[in-house]
Amino acid sequence: MLYRKISNLIENHLASRTNSILLIYGARQIGKTFIIREVGKKLFKNFIEINMIEDANGPGLFKNVTTVDDFLLHLSMVAGGELGDHDDTLVFIDEIQEYPELITLLKFLRTKGKYTYIASGSLLGVHLNGVSSIPMGSIMKVQMFPLDFEEFLIANNVGIEAIEEQKKLFEKELSPTPEEHSFFIDLFRKYLLTGGLPDAINEYLRSRNIHKIRAIQNETREFYAMDAAKYDKENKLKVERLYNTIPSFMENKKKRLIVRKIEEKKGKTFSDYASELLYVVNSGIALEVDAISNPFYPLAESETKSLLKLYMNDPGILSSIFYGDNIKAILNDEKSINLGAIYETAVACQLRANGYDLFYYDNKSKGEVDFLIDDTKSLSVIPIEVKSGRDFMVHSSLNTFTTNEDYGVKKAYVLSNSGTVLKKGIITYIPIYWTMFIQKQSFSDEELIIP
């Protein structure tokens, strides 16, 4: 079984017997159902799983449910003999987006207190926007992502102790040994091939067959397109076109979204694709990175420009599009191959999984920096530059950015293939696989006490 960090959150939430109901949402094929099932069966004597897509395609028992009594009646019809009470029965409502009004009903199911509930959905990020009454305070929404690099390491039997040792080096700004660097950079490149889809990683662990891995990734992309056609019928072609053009945007030097390229139509603006952009981001199949030209902490309060980048939600999917079954392009570090788009996608996915909202710096006169994130410890912005080549110490835009006193930057990172950690002023050069350690600041209990 693949280790998922979110399992700790799910287990703690359910074990706490809190009144709020946990909703796990995210893209398809990332392991939501599996991990909830594993944790639920571990903690509860009775585990009831109801897939609402299967119900909609079958008996439709829950299609017109509008009250708690109706829900409990139909629940007893499918799982009567397995139902206990609140403390020993977990009811898992899977693919809840199929019946959006059930999201509203969760509040009243919680109040009734007959059983414990948890829910998940592939398109909750989309459908929550259309729910008539979201039960605020009654639900806890958590977005799930494909496996990040740290989870990939654990899947490859890399010990927690070894990962923690790397984290200590990161915190002390010390270089790994050449042997350690060779080991981790090799696994990072393999992660660029497999990505974080559970089925793709399991196939890699089972067979190492790139053709089979690519088949899984390609099938997942097709699933995403099918979902778009099903849940946004009016604009499905525009959604598919937008999603399918993301790789081509990644191949451009600036990598930003060019509106006229989506449908090859002049005169189009972002407003013409507002709903489509909302879909690909809220469904979890793409990551949005907004442009900021005058950044200040917190970034959410900085004025954004009408520019953005879209990244695929998984580096393996992007590498399958760019390189197919050719693994040499990534594993052999070919000089003629620019892996910038793949590297940036991996970094975007890791930072997003670490809980960061993503921005990038774009200023006509001062250049561009790949990523900007908030640092809650120093109350400042951290700029991050991603370098896939050997000229990783060349970054004029980052230099300009970090020396601008108005921005108040206290720390910056350059991520590259190099295993040598360097510190030049406020810029720290670290191996790209250490992105997993760029995490939101956590505080001790003592520091949280208000005097």
What are these model-derived regions, one by one?
Residues 125-141, 153-158:
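Short regulatory helix/loop adjacent to the ATP-binding pocket of P-loop NTPases
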Residues 83-101:
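Conserved P-loop NTPase "ATPase switch" module shared by AAA+ and STAND
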Residues 157-328, 333-349, 359, 364:
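Interdomain hinge/linker elements that couple catalytic modules in large macromolecular machines
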Residues 56-86:
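Short glycine-rich substrate-engagement loop in P-loop NTPases that contacts/grips substrate
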Residues 1-15:
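N-terminal pre-Walker A segment at the start of P-loop NTPase domains
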Residues 116-122, 143:
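Structural recognition of the conserved hydrophobic beta-strand(s) that form the central parallel beta-sheet
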Residues 14-23, 27-29, 38-45, 281-451:
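A cross-kingdom feature that marks ATP-driven nucleic-acid transaction machinery
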Residues 32:
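Conserved lysine of the Walker
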